[in-house]
């Protein structure tokens, strides 16, 4: 298993992988709006929003004594309003740290998000556009005996294996109220627009363009029960992935609700609809705080790996509100994910 992990790390480091896994994304896409679409920056029913997440995979892999893959992340965003006009902007920032092989390979991602928010004429519809310049740094640990573990030569990794990439993402996002108890949203995101070149020693690979489509809805069945169906489709080169599912929100009190849902992740959806994971989710909202927990239960052939376990994600969100912003959702509707 350890050798298998080293090979995965090496392929990712040399840029020869064509998988969507080149870019960081989360099963709880609905709890990480800035990493899903920069046009969602500033869609906050409050003064500002802080969102944190932690993901790990293969956490019982004994070769390293720690999760083989782990990703903590944090985002911040807020709206800025232009007086009583129908327009505004959103600003935000994202920090992600993706570790592979128990810390042998480290990817650090930092981004600044900017969005333009526009409420349309009848107040039931709005559209936003976002831009997200970012940098991505890849570094090897000095503890990794790269050639020794892969080739048996006993050489150590050199600084030339480290790399830095600068690129930009862009997106657009629409939300609308179709009926008094039915809201919808849809978005399109383009990642890695500059398609920067990744240079590692004498090898070069392109950071390939990826696109993502998001569609979802909020359906109010009663004052206490809401349905939240949604999906995200991603494609990069000839690899695609579909995350789809539905959550049910039960409003316990005016300030407390509980959310349960099930999502399915499928790879190569266009060609063969190959199932990868079933992802149950539970969340709790209380006043300004939301906590969420999900687990990726692998259903693909990879579940037969002897030391494999699925992926666990923990999320925590805080939205700051003050008295004079109590009616902010009348200006910019924030979809309920």
Each model region followed by its residue ranges:
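Subset of outer-membrane beta-barrel
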Residues: 22-337
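Short, basic/polar N-terminal leader/transit segment immediately after the initiator methionine
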Residues: 3-6, 23-25
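Sec/Tat signal peptide C-region and signal peptidase I cleavage site
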Residues: 16-21
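Bacterial N-terminal signal peptides
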Residues: 6-15
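Positively charged n-region of N-terminal signal peptides that target proteins for export
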Residues: 1-4, 122
